[in-house]
Amino acid sequence: MTVLHSVDFFPSGKAPVAIEPRLPQAAFPEHHHDFHEIVIVEHGTGIHVFNGQPYTISGGTVCFVRDHDRHLYEHTDNLCLTNVLWRSPDAFQFLAGLDQLLPQEQDGYYPSHWRVNQSVLQQVRQLVGLMERAGDGMDAPAVANREILFMQLLVLLRRSSLMEGATKNDAKLNQLMAWLEDHFAEEVCWEAVAEQFSLSLRTLHRQLKQHTGLTPQRYLNRLRLIKARHLLRHSDHSVTEIAYRCGFGDSNHFSTLFRREFNWSPRDIRQGRDAIIQ
């Protein structure tokens, strides 16, 4: 597995934060690093496999990667990221208690992926721009200024994330997308889902297409196929059982959609034939 080292990304041996844009981020094999990372998705879509679990990411997704997490990107489509790298909580000169603003693992569950709305994403871009222009000076005021900007970023993300709740349409869409991550295998009636999240059906269609480039049903099918591919690789369930577990009522239809999406059949994935190009 590839290991990324802080010496290759941080401007100096003492700098606690670095900005690393990926415009765009191509598919990248599984890796981990000796630093922490906040991944901010500007736009586009892709699959983020985080500690073995696949997540569909798009504009407004924010992922918190710890120094022991492993992850990779695949199936990317114009996926543009900004990575805010930071060494460790004790690398800061003026900041303490950062863990109170970061997602925390509880009972084995780590809420690594948050979502923010588009207006917050614009504020994030502005803050990151200030961080990039803050310079590399190591005198106390310069260091304090950079650390303050990093703290402002954490506060903005914390207050604005899905976890804090919001009422605007794009925030409701973010909540809907998170709901689909957990309920993808269920029969989905889009009219009922739109009503559940206080969106008109037209708004749901328009905003999901703007966020992901996909219609609602196309997005749901892709989500189901991604989950199915994960099970094909990491479980002993039959292809038919996996199809049903992931919301497909017909295994033949599932196989057709699967091949169309990934250019491999479910059996190919089960036998590891795609591993050569992973």
Swiss-Prot record:
Quaternary structure, from the entry: Binds DNA as a dimer.
Localization in the cell: Cytoplasm
Annotated S-S bridges: none
Name used for this protein in its record: HTH-type transcriptional activator RhaS
All copies of domain HTH araC/xylS-type, residue ranges: 174-272
Residue ranges the UniProt entry marks as DNA-binding: 191-212, 239-262
Alphabetical list of CDD domains matching this protein: cupin_RhaR_RhaS-like_N
Functional summary from the UniProt entry: Activates expression of the rhaBAD and rhaT operons.
SUPFAM superfamilies in alphabetical order: Homeodomain-like, Regulatory protein AraC
GO molecular function annotations of the record: DNA-binding transcription factor activity; sequence-specific DNA binding
Domain of life: Bacteria
UniProt-annotated site: Interaction with sigma-70, residues: 241, 250
Major location (coarse): cytoplasm
